């Protein structure tokens, strides 16, 4: 594939300056990440790319020997998170950059090694010029941080429940980069619950003072409004099980043993996941069951798509149960991935019909789960727009009849979004029209549902050039192998180009590059 000993050095130019001469690439000054800045830069001449062995020790030796490229030795400030081997036989070492042993929030470095044990790419955020210590000390315990986070969101731990899912609340000590380039210790607190309403909170608590630095509800939506009409009424096959003298919507047919389970909340917003949908016969035909039938059938197809194309076993690739709850609330105009499961409202009849009736929306939500467990793109600004875009793109890969997203559930307009023509639904289709919206709930966290139109159009350009079969492999590899939580549009472009080169060679990589050039990136 023409890799040889070429090294693609990926560094966040906002964290360190590289004296590398590249056409059209300039290092950023200071510590403020530029929205259109790539952290996937190319460098041909290196001291050594061949590893003595494909392991953590050898990778760090490589980084040390190439310290001139990185403006210092990054090996001492990287902690191995995981190492994986992909279907091509390539190995990928994912590291967390640390300050005084504490991981830096939303930053990763990935070292990529080919089958000949040559390093062919490095990408991520090195923070190689960071201070040796943080500006503050740890005085608040993790238990106290969790309590402060609950207070900040106005909830009591006893007043919320995660239903049948495991308690995933946690407080992890992280180093947070400040605007002046220094670092502070803070707890990255995750609070997830499904009642009295779905929430997936991230709260940053200063580890010294206990002050709240940031709080965000990251429940990820396919849409903000909806409508409600009856479902299509088509007859579809269902994988069910027989339990306690009745048939239930529990799919046990998957060869990996992963279960797909569908519940009915009966218009409640509490006691999730709800009641397991059941029938005295093998048929589920009542009008109240139709939303559940669609959710169950569509999610089975989405699971099959990810498994047959990528051998991915559930959203986390660990075989976790895939849970859906339908009839969430009364006229609830949304579908959402809550961090542990999917919920579907019935809509209000004016904009949406029941949201479980759309295959591409189901795929969109499932992909949020995949993203959460891989690139974990932060849900704001460009990373958040990429999060939404990758969900839309895989929504299309699951439902290739047209380029629209949500066309089966909208009532007052043809669809929610369009990959081929984002401007049809008030989205930009070129970076020149990027909308700098506030990073608030009212500003859609920097326009994650708005600016996703730009990478969506790039995806359309890619698919029309390469076809679905190649494009879906390229997009999956980029999402699971190269992207990191803080990846920007430029990073996504570089990751997709590299993925195309890995899989299909330089000709197709050039087509991906052209697809992104066409949207101003």
UniProtKB/Swiss-Prot annotation:
Active site: 365, 449
Location in the cell: Secreted
The entry's keywords: Calcium, Hydrolase, Metal-binding, Metalloprotease, Protease, Secreted, Signal, Zinc, Zymogen
Residues binding Ca(2+) 2, per UniProt: 399, 402, 407
Cellular component GO terms held in the UniProt record: extracellular region
Binding residues annotated for Ca(2+) 1, in chain numbering: 360, 399, 402, 404, 407
Gene3D superfamilies xref list: 3.10.170.10, 3.10.450.40, 3.10.450.490, Neutral Protease Domain 2
Annotated cofactor note: Binds 4 Ca(2+) ions per subunit. Binds 1 zinc ion per subunit.
CDD domains hit by this protein: M4_TLP
Domain of life: Bacteria
Cofactor: Ca(2+); Zn(2+)
Pfam families (UniProt xref): FTP, PepSY, Peptidase_M4, Peptidase_M4_C
Propeptide, chain numbering: 28-221
Family affiliation: Belongs to the peptidase M4 family.
Name under which the protein is recorded: Bacillolysin
Organism: Bacillus subtilis subsp. amylosacchariticus
């Amino acid at each position: 594939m023409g890799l040889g000993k070429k090294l693609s050095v990926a560094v966040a130019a906002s964290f360190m300056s590289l004296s590398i001469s590249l056409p059209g690439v300039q290092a950023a000054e200071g510590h403020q990440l530029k929205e259109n800045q790539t952290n996937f830069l190319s460098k041909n001449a290196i001291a050594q790319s061949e590893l003595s062995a494909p392991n953590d020790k050898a990778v760090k030796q490589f980084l040390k020997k190439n310290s001139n490229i990185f403006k210092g030795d990054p090996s001492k400030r990287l902690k191995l998170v995981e190492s994986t081997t992909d279907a091509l036989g390539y190995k990928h070492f994912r590291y967390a950059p640390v300050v005084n042993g504490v991981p830096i929030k939303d930053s990763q470095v990935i070292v990529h090694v080919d089958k000949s044990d040559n390093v062919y790419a490095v990408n991520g955020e090195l923070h190689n010029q960071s201070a040796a210590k943080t500006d503050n000390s740890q005085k608040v315990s993790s238990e106290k941080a969790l309590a402060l986070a609950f207070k900040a969101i106005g909830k009591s731990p006893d007043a919320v429940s995660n239903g049948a899912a495991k308690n995933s609340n946690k407080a992890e000590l992280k180093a947070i980069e400040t605007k002046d380039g220094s670092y502070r210790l803070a707890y990255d607190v995750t609070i997830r619950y499904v009642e009295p309403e779905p929430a997936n909170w991230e709260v940053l608590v200063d580890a010294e003072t206990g002050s709240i630095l940031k709080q965000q509800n990251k429940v990820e939506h396919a849409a903000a409004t909806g409508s409600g009409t009856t479902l299509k009424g088509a007859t579809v096959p269902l994988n069910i099980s027989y339990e306690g003298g009745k048939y239930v919507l529990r799919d046990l047919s998957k060869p990996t043993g992963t279960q797909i389970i569908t519940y009915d909340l009966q218009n409640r917003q509490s006691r999730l996941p709800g009641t397991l949908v059941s029938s005295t016969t093998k048929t589920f035909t009542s009008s109240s069951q139709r939303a559940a039938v669609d959710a169950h059938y569509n999610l089975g197809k989405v699971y099959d798509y990810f498994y047959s194309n990528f051998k991915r076993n559930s959203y986390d690739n660990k075989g976790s149960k895939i849970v859906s709850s339908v009839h969430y609330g009364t006229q609830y105009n949304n579908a959402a991935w809550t961090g542990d499961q999917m919920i579907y409202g019935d809509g209000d009849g004016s904009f949406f019909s029941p949201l479980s009736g759309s295959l591409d929306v189901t795929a969109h939500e499932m992909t949020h789960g995949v993203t959460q467990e891989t690139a974990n793109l932060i849900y704001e600004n460009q990373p958040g727009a990429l999060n939404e875009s990758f969900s839309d793109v895989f929504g299309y890969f699951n439902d290739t009849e047209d380029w629209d997203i949500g066309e089966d559930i909208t009532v007052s307009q043809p669809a929610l979004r369009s990959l081929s023509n984002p401007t049809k639904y008030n989205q930009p289709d070129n970076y020149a029209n990027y909308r700098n919206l506030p990073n608030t709930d009212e500003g859609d966290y920097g326009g994650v549902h708005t600016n996703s139109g730009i990478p969506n159009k790039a995806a359309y350009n890619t698919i029309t050039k390469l076809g679905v079969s190649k494009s879906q492999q390229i997009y999956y590899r980029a999402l699971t192998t190269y992207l990191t939580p803080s990846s920007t549009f430029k990073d996504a472009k570089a990751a997709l180009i590299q993925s195309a080169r890995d899989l299909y060679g330089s000709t197709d990589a050039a087509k991906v590059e052209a697809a992104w050039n066409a949207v101003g990136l």
